[in-house]
UniProtKB/Swiss-Prot annotation:
It comes from the Eukaryota. The keyword RNA-binding applies. One of its GO terms (cellular component) is small-subunit processome. Residues 1-139, 591-625 are annotated as: Disordered. Residues 174-350 form the Helicase ATP-binding domain. Its EC number is 3.6.4.13. Associates in the nucleolus with the 60S and pre-60S ribosomal subunits. Pfam families: CTE_SPB4, DEAD, Helicase_C. The Q motif is unique to and characteristic of the DEAD box family of RNA helicases and controls ATP binding and hydrolysis. It catalyses: ATP + H2O = ADP + phosphate + H(+). This is ATP-dependent RNA helicase has1. It comes from Aspergillus clavatus (strain ATCC 1007 / CBS 513.65 / DSM 816 / NCTC 3887 / NRRL 1 / QM 1276 / 107).
């Protein structure tokens, strides 16, 4: 078995022997600069007493200058540190405690002489290997967290988070993970799997006494930035009484600030695939040689949005010896099985808490659909939102441009909504996500970027204005409500008369839905005012055209061609739904091939309907990380 955990200093030492020079990946800061020469270096060749006196005076002045320069260096270094922290706070949060601890470790490694390196090596040798560590073992299936034998610090954090009794996925996965087993888990969204993998990970870091200089010991890979931020928030609460550092690296955030944090040492790291691969390949001060645990969350979603190649490269780069891997996926596809094969050790434990359930969706969720012509869809949505202003609602659309248009329109006519989609800058996405999480009421309109894994409190309604790509996407969308024990929620899906065949696929997927009826007298008819507004407002007209085009493109790229056939759409009615009296002239080429991203997505799906035959519309990438 491998020896003790290596330190950043020992890795630097090896790099020095191999490449020469100082072996450091980045330029030294003012703090790391060595002091100016001492007095003995001032006049080593002088022999007369007079010259020695002059040398002493000169040496004393040099000492004073060096001391002043050292103070200035410390001051400027601190200011730079504060600026970087501000940058990190606006782009992607990293624990403030990790900065302090990492600074201490860096300061302790400035001395380049052999004695200091031997001392660091000796300290690293004191860290036990995985074989020498005994994590708690549990007999039977515990019901409460206190029965797991966890450390006092972890139990205190769990208690402060308000958790006492475990969910089924937690009862069945935490004990084998504490025992060091590799796990392939499947559970419904909202089942509590985040704590299932974070608790064993934090216990392992604590037992091995990981320090910032030891680098990253636990790596969690997430499909979307919002889900990564959410996992980071849970990790921050769970680690609040531990000394280990934690952080996050995601696309759209400040890469330089992230690299600085990684070089200081982040023991528990949450990341999205693209940005993680970037740091693994290009941030040389990023120490991941001591990785002990790899968590891949929402693996099926990661592969669907086109990160298959990145995940294969990541798994290949990361050390595999003595590494525990946890792979969680809501559905088991061929690609997920392939990823499990290359990432998990032989004989993993497969845990599925859903296969015995009668329904694929959670209890407490009332699910319905409404059959509505295309020209009446917006009128029904407007009427529904107007009557439920005191509720917390999420509305799903098929494309970013559809979200942008409807957000601009609804806000313009004094029906306030928030928008979330992949074309927004990361800071805007983050602010919107947390604003809606903290709101007691309001409406969020979004693409499927918000459909997977996000734990948004107390959502009353899920509205699927545009149809999901298949039953799995439907399940993940409605999973944003009725989260947690005894929680309640409702969902409503809009279907056109030509789309009722989708109900058969939902039934096969064990999804119970009933038809909701909305009396015509309850629907506010604002069609004439809508058409007048779109005709007179240049910016809304332009946005409506973009939304109309994107809707048709997304519809044509649907995986269930037998149900969602773009050639069966009544374009006059569809255009009216976007506020046009007649369909606008737009540049769409029928018969064009699907994009590479959509092909990858559809190849990874199960046969829920007819497969792509190469006929469709050109469209832009539907999903964003």
């Amino acid at each position: 078995m491998p020896g003790p955990v290596d330190t950043a200093k020992s890795i630097t030492k090896k790099r020095k022997r191999k490449h020469g020079g100082n072996g450091r990946a980045t330029a030294e800061t003012a703090d790391d600069a060595s002091p100016l020469p001492a007095a003995e270096n001032g006049a080593v060749t002088e022999s007369s007493a007079k010259k020695e006196v002059k040398a002493d005076k000169k040496s004393g002045k040099e000492k004073e200058k060096a001391l002043k320069k050292r103070k200035v260096s410390h001051s400027s270094s601190d200011e730079e540190e504060e600026e970087e922290d501000d940058e990190a706070a606006t782009s992607g949060p990293v624990d403030e405690a990790s900065d302090d601890e990492a600074e201490v470790e860096e300061d302790g490694s400035d001395n380049e002489d052999g004695d200091a390196e031997d001392k660091n090596d000796a300290e690293a040798a004191d860290l036990p290997s995985m074989d020498a560590v005994r994590l708690p073992t549990v007999d039977g299936e515990p019901q409460k967290f206190t029965e797991l034998g966890l450390s006092e610090k972890t139990l205190k954090a769990i208690n402060e988070m308000g958790f006492e009794t475990m969910t089924e996925i937690q009862r069945r996965t935490i004990p084998p993970l504490l025992a060091g087993r590799d796990v392939l888990g499947a559970a419904k969204t909202g089942s509590g799997k985040t704590l299932s993998f974070l608790i064993p990970a934090v216990e392992m870091l604590s037992a091995l006494r990981f320090k910032p200089r030891n680098g990253t010991g636990v790596l969690v890979v997430s499909p979307t930035r919002e889900l990564a931020l959410q996992i980071f928030g849970v990790a921050r609460e769970l680690c609040q009484h531990h000394s280990q550092t934690y952080g996050i690296v995601i696309g759209g955030a400040n890469r330089r600030a992230e690299a600085e944090k990684l070089m200081k040492g982040v023991n528990l790291l949450i990341a999205t695939p693209g940005r993680l691969l970037d740091h693994l390949q290009n941030t040389q001060g990023f120490v991941f040689k001591n990785l002990k645990t790899l968590v891949i969350d929402e693996a099926d979603r990661i592969l669907e949005v086109g990160f298959e190649d990145e995940m294969r490269q990541i798994v290949k780069i990361l050390p595999s010896e003595e590494r525990q891997t946890m792979l969680f996926s809501a559905t088991q596809t061929t690609k997920v099985e392939d990823l499990a094969r290359i990432s998990l050790r032989p004989g993993p434990l497969y845990i599925n808490v859903d296969h015995r359930k009668e329904h694929s969706t959670v209890e407490g969720l009332e699910q319905g659909y409404v059959i509505c012509e295309a020209d009446k869809r917006f009128l029904l949505l407007f009427s529904f939102l107007k009557r439920n202003l005191k509720k917390k609602i999420i509305v799903f659309f098929s494309s970013c441009n559809c979200v942008k248009y409807h957000a601009e329109l609804l806000n313009y006519i004094d029906l306030p909504v928030l928008e979330l989609h992949g074309k927004q800058k990361q800071q805007k996405r983050t602010n919107t996500f947390f604003e809606f999480c903290n709101a007691k009421q309001g409406t969020l309109i979004c693409t499927d970027v918000a459909a997977r894994g996000l734990d948004i409190p107390a959502v009353d309604w899920i509205i699927q204005f545009d149809p999901p790509d298949d039953p799995r996407d439907y399940i993940h969308r409605v999973g944003r409500t009725a989260r947690g024990a005894n929680a309640k929620g409702r969902s409503l899906m809009f279907l056109q008369p030509s789309e009722v065949g989708f109900l058969k696929h939902l039934k096969e997927a064990r999804v119970p839905v009933v038809e909701f009826e909305f009396p015509a007298s309850k629907i506010v008819n604002v069609q004439s005012q809508l058409e007048k507004l779109i005709g007179q407002n240049y910016y809304l007209n332009k946005s409506a055209k973009e939304g109309y085009r994107s809707y048709l493109q997304a519809y044509a790229s649907h995986s269930l061609r037998s149900v969602f056939d773009v050639h069966k759409l009544d374009l006059v009615k569809v255009a009216k739904g976007f506020g046009f009296s007649t369909p606008p002239r737009i540049d769409i080429q029928l018969g064009a091939s699907l994009s590479r991203d959509k092909k990858q997505q559809q190849q990874g799906r199960r046969n829920y309907g007819s497969q792509p035959n190469g006929k469709g519309l050109k469209f832009k990438r539907k999903y964003e990380d």
